[in-house]
UniProtKB/Swiss-Prot annotation:
This is Phosphatidylinositol-3-phosphatase SAC1. Pfam families: Syja_N. Residues 1-519, 569-586 are cytoplasmic. The chain crosses the membrane at residues 520-540, 548-568. PANTHER family: PHOSPHATIDYLINOSITIDE PHOSPHATASE SAC1 (PTHR45662), PHOSPHATIDYLINOSITOL-3-PHOSPHATASE SAC1 (PTHR45662:SF2). InterPro entries: SAC_dom. It comes from the Eukaryota. One of its GO terms (biological process) is phosphatidylinositol dephosphorylation.
């Protein structure tokens, strides 16, 4: 396998960037012309002694903004652990470096826009969860890697990567077109990775959890739901659990993704906006594309739909059920499980009903296993595709239970667990397992919803607690604020980073400056003034109680009435995306 370079130095001169490969026996230098933007391969002798030098740990890629081209590099990394003897790193800090030496060629308006775009890139890079390896392909599962050709093994990491999970694919377009420079390009995945060295019965093994977020139809909670015309589902995540013991490798894969037809749930200041199923499109085309690709990638599908079967979520459950029936594909099976109803009043033990319901199917699907000689002993023949509304909190709880059941059989088969022993009884490992799955939930939730996950007290401890309920309430409030007042910026940031929106070289019309309606400023001011006057009238009573009551009723009515008008026009007051708004209106 062609590896990427691990040790790099960035040399900066006014005319060029030189990225020097410092691996033993390597003379390659990547040269980027800051004026022509040409990228070429040269030698170490071409690096001027006057260049400013710094260590970097990878090139994330290049992107065009208003000021011109920018180079994005990884400046800090943290080792997560070793996966099958390959070092896995988390990128923890980045630098965005302009090709241009000055900004004198920009107008004030362009400077402002360029600063805004830089802020968007910085925001995406500040979200925790970017991982890479220079010697292991993190974009593929063990099973996919085992079923590849010798030609595939000789490809560079960038060339062979599963493009669904390469978050810097857009930034590396120039590298993709030039095979000779691909060793300088590192595919970066976004999601979560935990690697733990564990011991049960004196037997040491590595336990790994990997969640890969798809960069297709990526975005934030309320602005990206359902699927696009290609069948890509919002918040699609592939989660792989790996065991490495004495040369044996086992893995179990699950997926999650938004309900795969055309629906939306735009923020409108209400705590829980009502989901809307589109009536203007043919749902079956995209629905079929989605499951066709899933069957090709993973085999049989068991859909676990965990949404409520009453209230605003009910139409989505009914539509999903009807769509699967209409699909008529024997490879896709549908199971609805009303998570909140079944587990109401803290009866979380009732999740075992679902686990037992799918137990026979899970045994039939099996798991992937390779022995010490590299021989494939068993394949995973199907997958559980779980979803709730957000594919976060409820989904993660169910996935952790199914993964534990698979792990039980894997460890028994490998001889780590004795006959009759259960994972739940291994206190030290159980703590590692629960915390890793809770951390996985938090990572996926922060990346999609902007806060940590709900219900993680159950994942960490196996039971629901009062403190957990309190923290869920706090996280729900933070989600409400972010979903209504900052998610437009977050969505724009992701669209810019992934290339869904591109800044043209001849940048003229700004998409960022949208004329604000008068009511956007006037109504909140009127409401605040009216509410303040109501409080003042209560605190500073008039000569008679009737006079005080009249003032309080007047200002109170004005405050409530203005608030009602704001709520009625809620969509006008939320922070909406500006860059790719139309495409998000499926």
């Amino acid at each position: 396998m062609a590896l990427a370079y691990e040790n790099l130095k960035l040399h900066i001169t006014p005319e060029k960037f030189y990225v020097e490969a410092c691996d033993p026996g390597v003379e390659d230098v990547l040269t980027i012309d800051r004026v022509s933007t040409e990228v070429t391969l040269s030698g170490k002798k071409d690096i001027p002694p006057s260049a400013i030098t710094r260590a970097i740990y990878g090139i994330l890629g290049t992107i065009r903004l208003v000021a011109g081209m920018y180079l994005i590099v990884i400046t800090r990394r943290k080792k997560v652990g070793d996966l099958l003897n390959h070092s896995i790193w988390k990128a923890t800090d980045f630098d965005i470096i302009s090709y241009k030496k000055t900004m004198l060629h920009l107008t004030d308006s362009q400077l402002q826009d360029n600063k805004a775009f830089l802020g968007m890139l910085s925001h995406v890079l500040s979200v925790d969860g970017f991982y890479f390896s220079v010697s292991y392909d993190l974009t593929h599962t063990l099973q996919r890697l085992a079923n590849t050709s010798p030609e595939f093994q000789e490809m560079s990491l960038l060339e062979r990567a599963d493009q669904r999970f390469v978050w810097n694919g857009n930034l590396l377009r120039e590298f993709s077109a030039q095979p000779e420079i691909q060793k300088f390009a590192i595919p970066v995945v976004h999601g979560f990775i935990a690697i733990h060295s564990c011991s049960i019965n004196g037997k040491y093994f590595d336990w790994i959890l990997i969640s890969r977020r798809s960069c297709f139809r990526a975005g934030v909670r309320y602005y990206v739901r359902g699927i696009d015309s290609e069948g890509h589902a919002a918040n699609f995540v592939e989660t792989e659990q790996i065991v490495h013991y004495n040369g044996n490798k086992a893995s179990f894969v699950q997926t999650r993704g938004s309900i795969p037809f055309y629906w939306s749930q735009r923020p409108n200041l209400k705590y829980k906006p009502k989901p809307q199923i589109s009536k203007a499109v043919n749902h079956m085309d995209g629905f079929q594309r989605h499951f066709d690709s899933q069957v090709i990638s993973y085999g049989k599908q068991v859909v676990l739909n965990l949404v409520n079967q009453k209230g605003s979520e009910k139409p989505l459950e009914q539509e999903f059920s009807q769509m699967v029936s209409g699909l008529g594909n024997g490879m896709v099976r549908y199971i609805a499980f009303d998570f909140h109803k079944e587990c109401s009043r803290m009866r979380w033990d009732r999740l075992q009903i679902l686990v037992e319901q799918v137990a026979e199917t899970q045994d039939e699907f099996g798991y992937f296993l390779v022995d010490t000689e590299g021989k494939v002993v068993s394949q995973q023949d199907g997958i559980f595709r779980s979803n709730c509304m957000d594919c976060l909190d409820r989904t993660n709880v169910v996935q952790s239970l199914l993964a534990r059941r698979s792990l039980q059989y894997q460890l028994q088969r490998l001889g780590v667990l004795h006959v009759g022993q259960r994972i739940e009884e291994q206190i030290q490992f159980e703590k590692i397992y629960k915390n890793a799955w809770a951390d996985n939930a938090n990572a996926c939730a922060k990346q999609y919803a902007g806060t940590g996950a709900l219900k993680t007290d159950f994942t960490r401890t196996g039971k629901r607690t009062q403190w957990g309920l309190l923290m869920d309430g706090w996280n729900s409030l933070i989600r409400y604020y972010k979903n209504n007042f900052s998610d437009g910026f977050r969505q724009d940031s992701i669209d810019l980073f992934l290339g869904n929106y591109s800044v043209e070289e001849a940048y003229s019309t700004s998409p960022l400056h949208i004329q604000t309606d008068w009511k956007f400023l006037a109504l909140p001011i009127i409401m605040v003034v009216a509410f303040s006057m109501c409080i003042i009238c209560l605190l500073m009573a008039g000569d008679t109680w009737t006079e005080t009551l009249a003032y309080v009723l007047f200002w109170g009515t004005a405050s409530i009435g203005t608030g009602a008008i704001i709520m009625y026009n809620g969509k006008d007051f939320v922070d909406a995306p500006k860059l790719v708004q139309k495409e998000k209106m499926d």
